[in-house]
């Protein structure tokens, strides 16, 4: 084996997909990481690095013993959020985008984004920004769990054109927080979306019967990297 071949094999073996993880409303990076332990364990054979971040908007709580919770934006003046009600109010959103851009600059580049609920709604906006020329926010794919189209009127512009980003949309048949119809509607704004409906509710499915869906989707991007290396 020559030195060039050894270099290629080393590059392939060291290549790790880097995925940004965006939590849901009333969560944090820490909480989301704890809740997705089974998900990460199911993907341990795939070379992936997960980066968890916490939204910049703290949700007020009158209970001192409750772990701090955060959101990506609020839909009312009272600093609350309703995912399914149309609103012209979007407090904290600009700060969120500034924060996300900083994450991409300091902790990127990222290959993909993995997100849940309000985080998945935010991710749909990031996917639209992803195709903008010169955007700091750049990634190859997005996995959105219990996602939905943002109901903020300020975000309508992001859904005017088909979103050109590889996407996996996962949602629950019995989800009472974000009914599956909302996730199905979000998927229709994407070009060639991959959809998977599990029989459960509002959570990240991670049992053995579900993990293959994630593996099949993510491995396409590992294969693309291998092909690029082989053609060098």
Residue positions per predicted region:
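Serine-hydrolase catalytic machinery in alpha/beta-hydrolase-like enzymes
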Residues: 16-109
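A conserved short beta-strand
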Residues: 134-149
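Acidic catalytic loop of the alpha/beta-hydrolase fold
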Residues: 150-151, 173-178, 202-203
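Short beta-strand/loop motif that positions the catalytic acidic residue
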Residues: 163, 168-171, 175
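Post-His helix in hydrolase/transferase enzymes
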Residues: 206-220
């Amino acid at each position: 084996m020559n030195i060039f071949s050894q270099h290629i094999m080393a590059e392939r073996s060291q290549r790790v997909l880097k995925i940004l993880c965006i939590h849901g409303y009333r969560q944090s990076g820490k909480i989301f990481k704890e809740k997705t332990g089974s998900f990460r364990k199911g993907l341990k054979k795939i070379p992936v690095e997960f980066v968890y971040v916490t939204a910049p908007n703290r949700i007020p709580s009158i209970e001192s013993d409750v772990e701090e919770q955060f959101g990506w934006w609020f839909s009312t003046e009272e600093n609350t959020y309703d995912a399914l009600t149309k609103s012209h109010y979007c407090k904290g959103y600009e700060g969120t985008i500034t924060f996300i851009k900083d994450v991409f600059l300091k902790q990127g580049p990222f290959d993909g984004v993995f997100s849940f609920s309000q985080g998945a709604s935010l991710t749909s906006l990031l996917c639209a920004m992803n195709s903008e020329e010169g955007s700091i926010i750049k990634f190859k794919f997005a996995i959105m769990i219990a996602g939905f189209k943002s109901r903020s009127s300020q975000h309508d512009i992001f859904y005017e054109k088909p979103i050109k980003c590889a996407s996996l949309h996962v949602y629950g048949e019995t989800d009472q927080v974000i009914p599956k119809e909302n996730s199905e509607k979000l998927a229709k704004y994407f070009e060639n979306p991959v959809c998977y409906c599990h029989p459960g509710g509002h959570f990240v499915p991670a049992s053995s019967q579900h993990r293959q869906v994630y593996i099949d989707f993510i491995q396409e991007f590992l294969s693309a990297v291998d092909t690029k290396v082989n053609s060098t």
